Amino acid sequence: MNVYQLKEELIEYAKSIGVDKIGFTTADTFDSLKDRLILQESLGYLSGFEEPDIEKRVTPKLLLPKAKSIVAIALAYPSRMKDAPRSTRTERRGIFCRASWGKDYHDVLREKLDLLEDFLKSKHEDIRTKSMVDTGELSDRAVAERAGIGFSAKNCMITTPEYGSYVYLAEMITNIPFEPDVPIEDMCGSCTKCLDACPTGALVNPGQLNAQRCISFLTQTKGFLPDEFRTKIGNRLYGCDTCQTVCPLNKGKDFHLHPEMEPDPEIAKPLLKPLLAISNREFKEKFGHVSGSWRGKKPIQRNAILALAHFKDASALPELTELMHKDPRPVIRGTAAWAIGKIGDPAYAEELEKALEKEKDEEAKLEIEKGIELLKASGMTKQGLS
């Protein structure tokens, strides 16, 4: 088997099936990543969504015996939405991050990886592979960086010269000894715009993220959102793009190369109030094909409530009151009560008191009390201004 020729053939085949960038690296242990992960774990900075076994995250040969190399791929996704609908005072909208526009990228990249695997295995019967995207054991970003796809920027995103950081990543471990590519140089320079712009200070240092403070992570949690973050997520329903949109290296980067990644504006920027009463079936039918649906409707509904509070949308108060009184989920009842207080209409004070009297869940009860205090504070402020 001529490995050099096979590499060139694989590169050409990858282009033909719509892979925007491909790179190669060894299957050696990711030693520097191991040190970083141990540090992040000790600081409590991990999200909890990662593979818990650090050795598996840094040792490809634990995942594929006799592994010799890793093939990394990247697909560029759009950064701008065509005909994006606007929020109005009576029809407020939320936003899904760009990585949740169009068809779930996990499915898109798995399809590409399957084709690449089949291509290689058609060349020789002894070829072995193991592929993964996002939810696999390896760090997609660490592999992509070492394979020369892009460099790891201060916002922790893999940034490519061609497409900026608007790329999806995946990789395939193989027993073929492909010649590794050369990593590219860091292009951040002295710029710190991403660190300065992060709404929650999650980027604690250049290249170091406290995932527990990252809005992208927080929008995916299912419990009560900590108080300090509630006013910072704005109208984000899933994910956050701030550290990407402020990056100078992303300026002018907007690629519409894959039709399946094009966003439906009514899904990527949905109306908020209809989300409050959406059924499981309706949610699955409308949002089930996008990556932002993977945690179910509860986090999206909670975030929609917080977004309505962010807008101080008084037109949503009847729906929020209905949730506070009747929703079976304490997180939704409590968050709705907090939002009612945040919106600040004194006419709803009695509804909050009624809810507090009958509420049995201690956490939800605490949120109702917060709503009452917010409403009182709002009334005092209005009196002071009058």
UniProtKB/Swiss-Prot annotation:
Cob(II)alamin binds at R57, C97, D134, S139, D140, R141, S152, N155, I158, L169, S216, C240, D241. HAMAP family: QueG. Gene3D superfamilies: 3.30.70.20, Leucine-rich Repeat Variant. It holds the Pfam family Fer4_16. [4Fe-4S] cluster 1 binds at C188, C191, C194, C247. Binds 2 [4Fe-4S] clusters per monomer. PROSITE patterns: 4FE4S_FER_1 (PS00198), 4FE4S_FER_2 (PS51379). Keywords: 4Fe-4S, Cytoplasm, Iron, Iron-sulfur, Metal-binding, Oxidoreductase, Queuosine biosynthesis, tRNA processing. Its cofactor is cob(II)alamin; [4Fe-4S] cluster. Residues 178-208 form the 4Fe-4S ferredoxin-type domain. It comes from the Bacteria. Its EC number is 1.17.99.6. This is Epoxyqueuosine reductase. TRNA binds at Q220, K222, N280, R281, R295, K297, K298. Pathway: tRNA modification; tRNA-queuosine biosynthesis. GO terms for cellular component: cytoplasm. Catalyzes the conversion of epoxyqueuosine (oQ) to queuosine (Q), which is a hypermodified base found in the wobble positions of tRNA(Asp), tRNA(Asn), tRNA(His) and tRNA(Tyr). GO terms for molecular function: 4 iron, 4 sulfur cluster binding; epoxyqueuosine reductase activity; metal ion binding. Its main location: cytoplasm. HEAT-like PBS-type repeats lie at residues 333-357. Monomer.
